[in-house]
């Protein structure tokens, strides 16, 4: 296993910040450069079929899975691995470290915090292992300033509720408390 050349690129931020768009852009750039790429998406997010699709309908083919262990064998045959909705994979830290140490480039798009502004611990643990961390902001859907947080609409308290603008709004600090 190669111990050099691999890297982890982490893209974090709230809902609607463009994390999946940036993931797709980076993977497509590697594809143009003729790298073998694999994109993985969270299996329970079935809103857009078998691809990773942005809120503005940009799409890339992806393998749906509930566990990154399930894609480890096909990961051996690629050089770049894109992971969307990284916060939903409990073993993302060990998987990314293993793959990067094997010489692979990992591009992970993930929420950094819950709708309660609590950290996704697995993503926070990935930060010191990443060569590059990009924190994106969205636009506050109430006052149109920079938005760093995701606010859930409705009264559900579970952390994992898949949805788009029907379930969440991106908000700034001030509007989070409205």
Curated annotation (Swiss-Prot):
Its EC number is 2.7.1.21. InterPro entries: P-loop_NTPase, Thymidine_kinase, Thymidine_kinase_CS. GO terms for biological process: DNA biosynthetic process; thymidine metabolic process. Gene3D superfamilies: 3.30.60.20, P-loop containing nucleotide triphosphate hydrolases (3.40.50.300). Pfam families: TK. The active site is at 85 (proton acceptor). Substrate binds at residues 115, 159-163. Keywords: ATP-binding, DNA synthesis, Kinase, Metal-binding, Nucleotide-binding, Transferase, Zinc. It comes from the Viruses. ATP binds at residues 13-20. It catalyses: thymidine + ATP = dTMP + ADP + H(+). Coiled coil: none annotated. Zn(2+) binds at residues 140, 143, 172, 175. GO terms for molecular function: ATP binding; metal ion binding; thymidine kinase activity. Belongs to the thymidine kinase family. PANTHER family: THYMIDINE KINASE, THYMIDINE KINASE, CYTOSOLIC. This is Thymidine kinase. It comes from Myxoma virus (strain Lausanne).
